[in-house]
């Protein structure tokens, strides 16, 4: 670190013979002025940063001095414009409470997409409208509207091109039912409000899809078991305690999760996949291995900036 205690260099083990090294420098105000990533001898990323008098980021440049992205702000200090090197400009609009109400993406050829949102008096989102233009200038508009109950819980979603979704809740504010068209999913919980089971009944076919959830003592989800042969009216809790056996033909949709002492997901097992995860001291996920193939996640603070696969390391 430097004299002010800011991190100037961070090293992460990639492979047995190769490290990832992140280097930082800072200006007199403590703002990050440069950031670089090296994997072994290979420089993967090198950026420099500029700020305005209020220490707001206004420019990011690459190692050649070319502008990668620039930012502008409104009188309230909110981001009003983002200009990318590829020519895409994004403008942002806000209401009197500084909530995002509009976003427009455009290139030199015109608007490519736009988004708007409105809010209820209590701050909950009432409606969203998105419009996307294709290369011929034809626009596709989609809307989403939301309805809430007196406790602020969402009770209905209405979206363009899909069936409405409605929700009900139990006395503990857990979701009790979700209905999409002719398909209703009911949820069961234990006394700690942890999800135990879902029953999805297709009213047109009377088919009942069941997912059973197994949790550890900390409330982490250890496993999900898919069972379609359980009748909808079955209340036998022995179904909930069903053993999970990977590879069992009856239970081939199982998912089994393992956690460490910090309740971080460290391993997920399915019939076809074995996925493991690693974390740093801040709790950020630093690595993922899928069936033996490793991917390393590179962070700048809390922002993921790069993923390096085994082949790219």
Locate the predicted segments by residue:
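Short secondary-structure transition motifs
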Residues: 44, 77, 89-92, 96-105, ...
């Amino acid at each position: 670190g430097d004299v002010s205690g800011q991190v100037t260099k961070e090293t992460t083990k990639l492979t047995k013979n190769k490290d990832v090294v992140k280097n930082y420098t800072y200006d007199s105000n403590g703002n990050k002025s440069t950031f670089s990533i090296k994997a072994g001898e290979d420089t993967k990323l090198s950026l420099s940063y500029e700020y305005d008098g209020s220490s707001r980021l206004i420019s990011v440049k690459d190692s050649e001095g070319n502008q990668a992205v620039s930012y502008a702000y409104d009188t309230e200090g909110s981001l009003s414009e983002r200009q990318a090197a590829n020519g895409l400009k994004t403008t942002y609009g806000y209401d009197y409470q500084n909530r995002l109400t509009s976003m427009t993406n455009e290139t030199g050829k015109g608007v490519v997409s736009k988004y708007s949102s409105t809010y209820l008096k209590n701050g909950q989102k009432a409606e969203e409208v998105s419009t996307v233009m294709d290369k011929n200038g034809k626009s596709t508009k989609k809307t989403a509207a939301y309805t809430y109950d007196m406790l602020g819980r969402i009770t209905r979603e209405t979206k363009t091109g899909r069936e409405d979704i409605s929700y009900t809740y139990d006395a503990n504010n857990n979701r009790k039912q979700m209905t999409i068209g002719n398909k209703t999913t009911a949820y069961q919980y234990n006394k700690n409000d942890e999800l135990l089971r879902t029953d999805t009944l297709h009213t047109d076919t009377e088919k009942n899809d069941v997912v059973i959830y197994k949790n550890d003592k900390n409330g982490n989800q250890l496993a999900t078991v898919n069972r379609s042969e359980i009748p909808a009216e079955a209340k036998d809790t022995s179904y909930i305690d069903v053993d999970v056996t990977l590879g069992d033909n009856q239970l081939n949709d199982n998912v089994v999760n393992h956690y460490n002492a910090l309740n971080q997901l460290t391993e997920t097992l399915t019939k076809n996949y074995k996925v493991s995860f690693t974390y740093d001291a801040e709790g950020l996920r630093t690595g993922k291995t899928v069936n033996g193939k490793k991917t390393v996640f590179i962070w700048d603070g809390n922002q993921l900036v790069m993923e390096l696969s085994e082949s790219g390391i």
